[in-house]
Amino acid sequence: NKLQPDFLQENQRTYYPFGKLATETGRNGVSTVYLWTKDNGSYPVAKIVNASLAEVTAITGNPENIYKNGLYLDIETRLRNELPHAQITTINAAPLIGVQKTTDPNGITTLYVYNSDNLLQEIIWQGAVIKRYEYNYRNR
């Protein structure tokens, strides 16, 4: 089964048994690994660029659906230390609320603060509020 000469495969993807994206390899050969929360993968907890699933699994153990709201700190630290060639973004999320914290490949953390109604209230980057949301309710 030969591909048409004008057909160019962009990405190759693999999936976990629970249906979420496990790896994506671009045309340039760079592999990205995705890790998800343990509640059937509601939220991503890590995006690891320039690493293989085998490399990540050697550090995390079975990556299928094992993280509650984010990577355990020791696993995140090991990934960053043992995969210096990788660009790692981590995400912590609260069920039914949303993302609470992201840490980019440079180690810069962004916090997401929610109000008592679980609506996004502030985004804090490098200790400073960069975005504030105000909700004006009618008949409240």
Language-model segments: which ranges?
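Beta-strand elements of repeat-based all-beta scaffolds
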Residues: 1-26, 30-104, 109-140
